[in-house]
């Protein structure tokens, strides 16, 4: 037990944690040089392309330290992006230590702070590491100063390394062994193992990644999952080094995988405790994780109606690997049958869409993302509205509408403060705090979540040339003057185009959307009226002019009444068409709503 060290690597996006993980695996001989590839632990294509880590991965390594002992190191790689912070907290709760990787040329950024606080809350020993010291722009002393100022942990003896060249990586491991405590636990006690992650494998069913806290788990054991009460027979246990290696048993302090012939992921909940069947059952489950609540909702619809079942199966399969994705069936008059999906944030939403399109070949229409509003009705009931179409139709019944407010922490170099403050003000933010740390400035704002999901992140990156970083957490619901803007096409409401916006901004948004629709909707044989309305008040209107055939082409000279007759006849025909015709709304129209703000 004394020779085991469980640790994870936390850092801001692009500070080099996956590269450092690669070097550590190479140094410990986890993979031969031939099998070594960049970002070994990022196994999804999307992860490699975008250069981000989404799912936490593990590797059990053995390292011969300078004191001559061989240590078993369990590395758990974590994502750095704010949307996946729940993955980080899960990984950290299985560890005793964390390497806090800071890019020596960039200094401390938003996720560095957020993840580090998560680690400290969970009682994990944080070991600061300065990466990228080979860069000409590296300024390790300044980075150390920032770590101490902003996060408040002692970083005077922070290890310096370069994951790219490999220098200093051995020192990182030595610091890790010296500072991180060995796991506590009793291999002879009743079994308690925490499920850190679970995913679906086509051959063996559900694979669970567990951290054994007490007891010993062997193949052929009968185990009980405490949350569901279901019993299973363990078929195989083992560790990842990063390839899977079967072992006879996993004992207290170890991290490894368990395969028990479970068919669906619902049965193996992340955060659940595995124990033996009575009489050797553990008294109580381990404290799990808090359930993640989706923050952003959007409708996903198949482009072709007959793909609905396929979409449902794809979502079920995705949910096998992504416990935080939530979805329920939904019907829209404009788009037919589809699903209302809940995501952790915008990046999560993009990734789910991309995985559906890539891994399952789905063609999707996505509606504008919305957040959950609470509507207080006159009769005292509270309604949750996560879809603009569900907003109560009669405004006189509504007492108040509450919108979610988030606390946003922003970090940026001094010269961009003005631009960022202007952006936050535009987004109805109120400033809570502002502090200077060397050349970095930290701003704290309270901003409505609805403004963040539109395009806050993209705009923040563009006004700060990519230097600002942010992370946000939910604070509370507040009463707000928001209204629902409906889009009518030829007098018919298109439910999928409805948006909920603040009243001060509603006329502008209505006009913008109507103008955008006019560009996108193809011309028909009759005039198409596009209107934006709040309740019964139309706030904007655009017309798509009709295409017409020149019916007078065959008339040369002659009497005016002949021409009039032909024109009247054409007018009649157009009128009849307008009564029976329906307007096809192209896919771009639904995306246009998202892009209205960007001009």
Swiss-Prot record:
The keyword Lipid biosynthesis does not apply. It is a peripheral membrane protein. InterPro entries: EF-4 (IPR006297), EFG_III/V (IPR035647), EFG_V-like (IPR000640), EFTu-like_2 (IPR004161), G_TR_CS (IPR031157), LepA_C_sf (IPR038363), LepA_CTD (IPR013842), LepA_IV (IPR035654). Its EC number is 3.6.5.n1. HAMAP family: LepA. GTP binds at residues 14-19, 131-134. Keywords: Cell inner membrane, Cell membrane, GTP-binding, Hydrolase, Membrane, Nucleotide-binding, Protein biosynthesis. Belongs to the TRAFAC class translation factor GTPase superfamily. Classic translation factor GTPase family. LepA subfamily. It comes from Ralstonia pickettii (strain 12J). It is an enzyme of class 3 (hydrolase). One of its GO terms (biological process) is positive regulation of translation. Its main location: membrane. This is Elongation factor 4. It catalyses: GTP + H2O = GDP + phosphate + H(+).
